[in-house]
Amino acid sequence: MPGAPLRLRNTTRGTIVAGRVTSAGTFWTSFMGLMGRPSIDLDEGLWMPGVTNIHMFFMRFPIDCAFLGPESPDGQRDVVALRHRMPAWIGIVWRAPGARGVVELAPGALERSATQIGDRLILEPATR
């Protein structure tokens, strides 16, 4: 569903993690992630399916990251790892075991939504 507006909802906590999530539909958009952007809005995120490690080189701002496991039949995914406020330029996650993708988020998004490891999240159309 690349290009379609999405939101990331924490079904365990009943919270919205990010209301405007873009899906990286190509290798290049996953490779670039949020590099080169001057900032990220508080309600924004980037879903990168298939990505299990990230780096912060060339990033201009810190981010939160939620690493998600495989999609269940109902479309939900378990949170397998979290990184809060990864600093620009120096943060790195080599591998998040069990991850099948990662969502890059504005710093503080995970705390605001009370998201924890083991929670179930769903990417769904933003119009819901």
Segments from the language model and where they lie:
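Compact, glycine-rich, soluble single-domain proteins
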Residues: M1-R128
